[in-house]
Amino acid sequence: MQCLTITAVQRERDTQSLSVITAELEPVRAPSLIAFFHGHSACMCPFRWRYSRFSLKQQRILAHDPVNTFGIDRRHTIKFCLSAKQRPYPTITIRWQLSDNMVYTEKHIRIISVTTAAAIHPVIGSSENDVQLRTRHPETTAD
């Protein structure tokens, strides 16, 4: 399974501790191409956390629409960033596939002029290909 990201959402009472892993995860969707090409429903492999040694339950999931990969990675935090709200807590980096969020100038050519579209620079990226990085505080819900 390529590009399948398991995301753990923090509980409300542990908003400042980024190392809390909740065991109450539910798989929401499965990539539809797995069931379409292989003829069986997607099976989530057990996820074993290396420090606490617990495994999440293996579960069969029916095929749904493909999900957008979404990950939170503190190792790729942009250090030199400006924020409207300065907070004492460390920032985290939200990353996702750049191809899902690209600006297609040919569709918006009447809104954006050609000279303006040529002056748009690519977003700050990481060493991985096709990945876009943005920084925000963990307690901010709006992008």
From Swiss-Prot:
Record key words, sorted: Transposable element
Top-level taxon of the source organism: Bacteria
Name this polypeptide is given: Insertion element IS2 uncharacterized 16.4 kDa protein
Origin species: Escherichia coli
